[in-house]
A protein has these predicted regions:
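N-proximal helix/coil linker or "cap" segments that precede and/or mark the start of modular domains
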Residues: 3-33
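Short, acidic, Ser/Thr-enriched surface-loop or helix-capping motifs
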Residues: 25, 38-39, 143-144
Length: 174
C-alpha cells in the first residue's frame, strides 16, 4: 500500500511538473520510423507496416486501470480495425516481460512494444520525463499506408478511444 501511494505520487508529480517540450509531430509529416521489440521479443519496424494503416498508441503502464481499459477495448475491436486494413501497435516504456504478462492476462492480439529507453516516445512527443523517471503519455497516432501522420490524439479517453479510432479510420479512407 505504501509503495503504491509513493508510485502514484511520483506519477502525479511527473504529470504535473514535467514539460513535453515542443509539439513536434504534425499531421501530414512522415511518422518517425523505429524498431522496437514486442512481448514475444519479436522486432517491429514501423516501415514493416508500409501499405497498411497503423494505430500507434502510447500508454503509461501495463496492467493499470486506464491502460487495461484502453488495451481491452482495442482487443475487442481488433477485427473491425483489421477490416479497415489497419494494425494496432501499443507502446510503453515497460519491458518485454511486463508486456508478456499484461498481454497474456488480457488476451491482447496485437503487439505491445517496449520502448525502454523512451527514444520512440520522445520522438513522438509522447513522453513525460523527470530525470531518470520516464512514462509514456496516453497519445495515439493514426499513420496512413504511406507512413505519414494522418491524425493524432493528445487527450485520449480510454473508455471510448477504440470506437473513435474506427470512426476516424472509416472517414479517412473515404
Amino acid at each position: 500500500m505504501r509503495y503504491t501511494l509513493i508510485n502514484l505520487s511520483l506519477l502525479f508529480f511527473i504529470m504535473l511538473f514535467s514539460s513535453s517540450g515542443k509539439a513536434g509531430i504534425k499531421a501530414g509529416e512522415a511518422a518517425p520510423d523505429f524498431e522496437l521489440f514486442d512481448q514475444y521479443n519479436k522486432p517491429h519496424k514501423l516501415s514493416d507496416y508500409n501499405g497498411k494503416w497503423v494505430v500507434l498508441y502510447f500508454y503509461p503502464k501495463d496492467d493499470t486501470p486506464g491502460c487495461t481499459t484502453e488495451a481491452c477495448n482495442f482487443r475487442d475491436d481488433i477485427f473491425r480495425i483489421r477490416k479497415l486494413n489497419a494494425e494496432v501497435l501499443g507502446v510503453s516504456v515497460d519491458n518485454t516481460e511486463s508486456h508478456a504478462k499484461f498481454s497474456g492476462k488480457h488476451g491482447l492480439p496485437f503487439p505491445l512494444l517496449s520502448d525502454g529507453d523512451a527514444k520512440v516516445a520522445r520522438s513522438y512527443d509522447a513522453l513525460w520525463s523527470l530525470g531518470p523517471i520516464k512514462v509514456a503519455k496516453r497519445h495515439t497516432f493514426i499513420i496512413n499506408p504511406e507512413g505519414k501522420i494522418a491524425k493524432f490524439y493528445r487527450d485520449v479517453n480510454p473508455e471510448n478511444h477504440s470506437s473513435e479510432i474506427i470512426r476516424v479510420l472509416e472517414t479517412l479512407q473515404k
